[in-house]
Amino acid sequence: MKISGNMSKYNKKISFFEILSQIPSNREDWYIFECDAVGKAPNNLTMSEFEDLVLNSKYGYQMSWDELLKFSKEIEDINNLIVVSSTSPVEFEMIEKGAEALQVRVEIYDSTTWEIEFYG
């Protein structure tokens, strides 16, 4: 099942946290594969350092659901983002193919649209 929308509603920008609020609370591991954003990065990293770390992580940058929600509240604006929940670590290429381990995929494109896909 897929749901999607625009990043602005009634001339107001939708936050990353608001997008995540469409996903039921869970205990899954989440992996960030792309992050081009403005805001506060986790673990006292600069956003530039965090973006580089994410891009250079074979299996994405791992977070719990609670960590992802906390991170989402620190983000002011997102240009591009790809984050997935998965029962086991997956490589980026497997996201494109829809690996069996995938449970949810969240993408934000060019600061304009977002999409959530639920697998299984």
Task: Please name every model-derived segment.
Residues 112-118:
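Short cationic amphipathic helices and targeting signals
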Residues 1-3:
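Ser/Thr/Pro-rich, acidic low-complexity intrinsically disordered regulatory segments
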Residues 6-59:
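N-terminal interaction modules that seed assembly of large macromolecular complexes
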Residues 45-106:
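Surface-exposed, low-hydrophobicity interaction/linker segments
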